[in-house]
From Swiss-Prot:
One of its GO terms (cellular component) is cytoplasm. This is Alpha-endosulfine. The gene is ENSA. It is found in: Cytoplasm. GO terms for biological process: cell division; G2/M transition of mitotic cell cycle; mitotic cell cycle. Its main location: cytoplasm. Protein phosphatase inhibitor that specifically inhibits protein phosphatase 2A (PP2A) during mitosis. When phosphorylated at Ser-67 during mitosis, specifically interacts with PPP2R2D (PR55-delta) and inhibits its activity, leading to inactivation of PP2A, an essential condition to keep cyclin-B1-CDK1 activity high during M phase. Also acts as a stimulator of insulin secretion by interacting with sulfonylurea receptor (ABCC8), thereby preventing sulfonylurea from binding to its receptor and reducing K(ATP) channel currents. GO terms for molecular function: phosphatase inhibitor activity; protein phosphatase 2A binding; protein phosphatase inhibitor activity; protein phosphatase regulator activity. Residues 1-53, 79-121 are annotated as: Disordered. The modification N-acetylserine is found at S2.
Length: 121
């Protein structure tokens, strides 16, 4: 029984060795490509923060996308002060449902519609 285990272990080791060599061969082309790119573009990868232009723009402060963003930021600075309503605070709307008789007469249009001409050819 011990002989069978010893026979199985060398087979497993050779399988693991094959995987290791395949991984090493797979890594070598990647390393070669990285070396080529580093030789071609030596300035890449040196600054973790990005380019000087980007760092300068980030140091200037917050920029707003449009006037809506600016107004929202401005409103936050005012500590959320809500504008007070005028003297009509007790005004209730929606208690009367209009009917066709309550509505004023519709004004006639000065320009006649081409669709309402009524002429059929």
């Amino acid at each position: 029984m011990s002989q069978k285990q010893e026979e199985e272990n060398p087979a497993e080791e050779t399988g693991e060795e094959k995987q290791d060599t395949q991984e090493k061969e797979g890594i070598l082309p990647e390393k070669a490509e990285e070396a080529k790119l580093k030789a071609k573009y030596p300035s890449l990868g040196q600054k973790p923060g990005g380019s000087d232009f980007l760092m300068k723009r980030l140091q200037k402060g917050q920029k707003y996308f449009d006037s809506g963003d600016y107004n929202m930021a401005k409103a936050k600075m005012k500590n959320k002060q809500l504008p007070s309503a005028g003297p009509d605070k007790n005004l209730v709307t929606g208690d009367h449902i209009p009917t066709p008789q309550d509505l004023p007469q519709r004004k006639s249009s000065l320009v006649t519609s081409k669709l309402a001409g009524g002429q059929v050819e």
